[in-house]
UniProtKB/Swiss-Prot annotation:
It comes from the Bacteria. PROSITE patterns: RIBOSOMAL_L23 (PS00050). Keywords: Ribonucleoprotein, Ribosomal protein, RNA-binding, rRNA-binding. PANTHER family: 60S RIBOSOMAL PROTEIN L23A. GO terms for biological process: translation. InterPro entries: Nucleotide-bd_a/b_plait_sf, Ribosomal_uL23-like, Ribosomal_uL23/eL15/eS24_sf, Ribosomal_uL23_CS. The keyword Lipid metabolism does not apply. This is Large ribosomal subunit protein uL23. Disulfide bonds: none annotated. One of the early assembly proteins it binds 23S rRNA. One of the proteins that surrounds the polypeptide exit tunnel on the outside of the ribosome. Forms the main docking site for trigger factor binding to the ribosome. Belongs to the universal ribosomal protein uL23 family. The lineage of its organism: Bacteria, Pseudomonadati, Pseudomonadota, Alphaproteobacteria, Hyphomicrobiales. The gene is rplW. It comes from Methylorubrum extorquens (strain PA1) (Methylobacterium extorquens). GO terms for cellular component: ribonucleoprotein complex; ribosome.
Length: 98
């Protein structure tokens, strides 16, 4: 399968945290994705970019926190994450580049 340039716009970056690393034991990988990306788009992008079979996609949107920037109140951007479940036997090493 070949990757389309728009797939690189859907998958922003992998999430590398302790919780995300623990999910790899359950054959799941966590990615930051574009805010308007849909589950079918995320599934297609991961399958084409990493050459794996995706069995499920769960998404969540983390609302941005209110913070002070140089004495003025501001708000961080919302972040959309996707938890991608891979087929048995497929793995993605997120520590390496695409």
């Amino acid at each position: 399968m070949s990757a389309d340039p728009r797939h690189y716009d859907i998958i922003v970056s992998p999430v590398i945290t302790e919780k995300a690393t623990n999910l790899t034991e359950q054959n799941k990988v966590v990615f930051r994705v574009a805010p308007k990306a849909t589950k079918p788009q995320i599934k297609e992008a991961v399958e084409r970019l990493f050459d794996v079979k995706v069995t499920g996609v769960n998404t969540l949107t983390t609302k941005g926190k209110k913070k002070f920037f140089r004495g003025q109140r501001g708000q961080r951007s919302d972040v959309k994450k996707a938890i991608v479940t891979l087929a048995e036997g497929d793995t993605i090493d997120v520590t390496t580049g695409l």
